[in-house]
Amino acid sequence: LNIPKGRMVLLVGGSGAGKTTFINAITGFEKADAKILLDGKDVYKSFEDVKYDIGFVPQMDMIRYNDNVRKTVLDAASLRLPISISDKEKNEIVDGVLDEFGLKAVEDNMVGKLSGGQKKRESIAMEFVSNPSLFILDEPDSGLDGVLARELMEHLHRISREGKIVIVITHSPDRVLDLFDDVIVLAKDADRTGRLVFYGLVEEAKAFFDRDRMEEIVKVINQKEEGGLGMADELIVKYGEIRNGRK
């Protein structure tokens, strides 16, 4: 895969398709039998140099509920920013991030008192302090209603337009599909091994799978015992032939 900067990418696949393994591989948490390059640097060989250029927000909020908003983001900045940065610079960066995510007005509030949407933005802000070029989010819209979910995804879309790669896993992709540039589709083959079924533009994915909705695409590739159509293997072959220049 070659993902250009400035793209917002949807990652979809059924349960056990390899989404978590894929994310762990590109973030350097697990070493895959592959070369992962970020800005020309090998993630595995130069992990200490690139680890803070990768932002990862897990599905569960990894935040301290018994501390205030600013202190939580400031502590994240202390971990993610170079030690050469002064306290003054660090506080200026935190101010900018709090503004960016609409948290400045509640910076003195306890995190536990925030709304669900604010907690999501707090989690994202903690990773954003190091201004990563690769931003990965696992179900950032989980637990949010349609309006709040769209507002959050629109914000992530704007972040991608700043020249960053934003990769998002969501179980409700169709309500925000227009915000994504590309889609990565993973599926289990007959041996129950996670495989790449498709990577490309959203509209190309619709044509490839002959489906208009991502939820329908996942059903196509899921195994029959999981309520799917069990077409993963033939589509894996089809995509491989396309990548190799054969019809």
Predicted features by range, described:
Residues L1, G14, L38, I93, ...:
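Topological signature of polytopic alpha-helical transporters
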Residues M60, Y65-P82:
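Q-loop/switch helix immediately C-terminal to the Walker
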Residues E89-V106:
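Conserved ABC ATPase "signature" region
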Residues T27:
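Helix-to-loop junction immediately C-terminal to a conserved catalytic motif
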Residues F135-E139:
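Catalytic Walker B motif of ABC-type/P-loop ATPase nucleotide-binding domains
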Residues E127-F128:
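ABC ATPase C-loop
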Residues M110-L114:
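Conserved ABC ATPase signature
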Residues A34-Y44, V50:
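Conserved ABC transporter NBD signature motif
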